[in-house]
């Protein structure tokens, strides 16, 4: 048995310079695993609790020493001598120890760090790559990257309301080819912005963060960059949006405070998206309505759900119970998977399996506050989700995931599959 003999944690910094939790797990054989926990900027109300210290004298109250202490004491004691290869039992022990619905006692950041580090240690123990250990022998589907090359919303201090404008290399033959295509468009976008005397500073996720006249203007400059790179919009490169509409929703209306655009009703929003689908090669819209606007979500799904992937992020929070409600009510048709929204790997896999059984797509995702940890790259292949969001091909915290996927594709040699546009029905 691969018994756990040591569990320890420390406070490290994420890509925004905020503290986060890193965990080490050591087994009796000497096998070890390490994992670092990401953190979001725009967070859903129903996400598991990220435990912060609240001491204004340290990191503006964002320290995580209490979460670290929970790992080093209660959690370490509870997991001693447990079998690291029994992930479900380990995660169940964590859930039982916390004893709350939202993981507010121990902290989802403490629990997730342990859950991921245990999986890494177990993979090392049995001599398998992490993606193979988690996914089994059939794990060979590389994800199509959704590359956030223009940032707005809570991820940037500009005049763009929508949080992410992404490009998707649907016409690529492999992950490596898709990454190349997306990167070439990213560099062309910089040239387009320079030609317009716009800022080429980047946001939290590595995408450019210029001040633009409107959210639609972002689509136009990206189309220009795609064509300048020698690609065909819609055939080679498609578009995706993360509206993060919960950040815009107040008193039944969507307010565009950054750009100063007129407020819109849920019906207006749905009609706007439908119009954009006619004008631009958009194949995916994430959080197009607020997490608290289920009627708006229903309207949106009925209006464009047959021809566009509609992803619930804040809506579902990687939570199987909330996802089940969405499935029952025919709301959205895909779920964003963020491991720190739910707090354990077991619950993450449960959400993915529920989505798959209902015909919903899953998109594995980073957070805006990331680390150099590449766990989600392996997770994307292990679950055969077929899609990943991990930012622009810029900033080491984002590129680390892309580079890990390149390594995995190389390891799989001729067995790797890249779904391309097929995952969107194109």
Curated annotation (Swiss-Prot):
The alphabetized list of GO BP terms reads: glycolytic process
What's in the keyword line of the UniProt record? Answer: Cytoplasm, Glycolysis, Lyase, Magnesium, Metal-binding, Secreted
Q: List the SUPFAM superfamilies.
A: Enolase C-terminal domain-like, Enolase N-terminal domain-like
Q: What is its EC number?
A: 4.2.1.11
- Does the keyword Metal-binding feature in the UniProt annotation? yes
- Which cofactors does this gene product need? Mg(2+)
Q: In which pathway does it act?
A: Carbohydrate degradation; glycolysis; pyruvate from D-glyceraldehyde 3-phosphate: step 4/5
Q: Which GO terms describe its molecular function?
A: magnesium ion binding; phosphopyruvate hydratase activity
Q: Which InterPro entries match?
A: Enolase, Enolase-like_C_sf, Enolase-like_N, Enolase_C, Enolase_CS, Enolase_N
Task: List the GO cellular component terms.
Answer: cell surface; extracellular region; phosphopyruvate hydratase complex
Q: Give the note describing cofactor binding and stoichiometry.
A: Binds a second Mg(2+) ion via substrate during catalysis.
Record-listed (2R)-2-phosphoglycerate binding positions: 163, 338, 367-368, 389
Location within or outside the cell: Cytoplasm; Secreted; Cell surface
Residues at the catalytic site: 205, 338
The kind of enzyme this is, by top-level EC class, is: lyase
Swiss-Prot/TrEMBL catalytic activity? (2R)-2-phosphoglycerate = phosphoenolpyruvate + H2O
Q: Which domain of life is it from?
A: Bacteria
Family membership noted in the UniProt record: Belongs to the enolase family.
Q: Which HAMAP family match?
A: Enolase
Q: What is this protein called?
A: Enolase
**Lineage, top ranks:** Bacteria, Pseudomonadati, Gemmatimonadota, Gemmatimonadia, Gemmatimonadales
State which gene encodes it. eno
């Amino acid at each position: 048995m691969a018994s756990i003999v040591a569990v320890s944690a420390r406070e490290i910094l994420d890509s925004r310079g905020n503290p986060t939790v890193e965990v080490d797990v050591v087994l009796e054989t000497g096998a070890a695993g390490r994992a670092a926990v990401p953190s979001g900027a725009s967070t859903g109300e129903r996400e598991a609790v990220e435990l912060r210290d609240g001491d204004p004298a340290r990191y503006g109250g964002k320290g995580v020493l209490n979460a670290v202490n929970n790992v080093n004491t209660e959690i370490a004691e509870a997991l001693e001598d447990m079998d690291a290869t029994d992930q479900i039992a380990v995660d169940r022990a964590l859930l039982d120890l916390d004893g709350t619905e939202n993981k507010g006692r121990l902290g989802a950041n403490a629990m997730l760090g342990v859950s991921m580090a245990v999986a890494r240690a177990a993979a090392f123990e049995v001599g398998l790559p992490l993606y193979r250990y988690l996914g089994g022998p059939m794990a060979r589907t590389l994800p199509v990257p959704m590359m956030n090359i223009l940032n707005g919303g809570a991820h940037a201090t500009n005049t763009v309301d929508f949080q992410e404008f992404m490009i998707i290399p649907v016409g690529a033959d492999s992950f490596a080819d898709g990454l190349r295509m997306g990167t070439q468009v990213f560099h062309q976008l910089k040239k387009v912005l320079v030609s317009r005397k716009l800022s080429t500073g980047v946001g939290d996720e590595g995408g450019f963060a210029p001040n633009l006249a409107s959210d639609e203007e972002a689509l136009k400059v990206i189309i220009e960059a795609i064509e300048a790179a020698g690609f065909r919009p819609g055939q080679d490169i498609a578009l995706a949006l993360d509206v993060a509409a919960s950040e815009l929703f107040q008193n039944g209306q969507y307010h565009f405070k950054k750009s100063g655009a007129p407020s819109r009703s849920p019906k207006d929003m749905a009609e706007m998206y439908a119009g954009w689908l006619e004008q631009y090669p958009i194949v995916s819209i994430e959080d197009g309505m607020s997490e608290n606007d289920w009627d708006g979500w229903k309207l949106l799904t009925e209006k464009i759900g047959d021809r566009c992937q509609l992803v619930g992020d804040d809506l579902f929070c990687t939570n199987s119970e909330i996802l089940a409600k969405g499935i029952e009510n025919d709301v959205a048709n895909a779920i964003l998977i963020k491991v720190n929204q739910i707090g354990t790997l077991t619950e993450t896999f449960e959400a993915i399996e529920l989505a798959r059984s209902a015909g919903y797509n899953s998109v594995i995702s980073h957070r805006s506050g990331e680390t150099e940890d590449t766990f989600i790259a392996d997770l994307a292949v292990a679950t055969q989700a077929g899609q990943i969001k991990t930012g622009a091909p810029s900033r080491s915290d984002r590129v680390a995931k892309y580079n890990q996927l390149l390594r995995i594709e190389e390891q799989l040699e001729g067995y790797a599959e890249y779904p391309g546009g097929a995952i969107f029905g194109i």
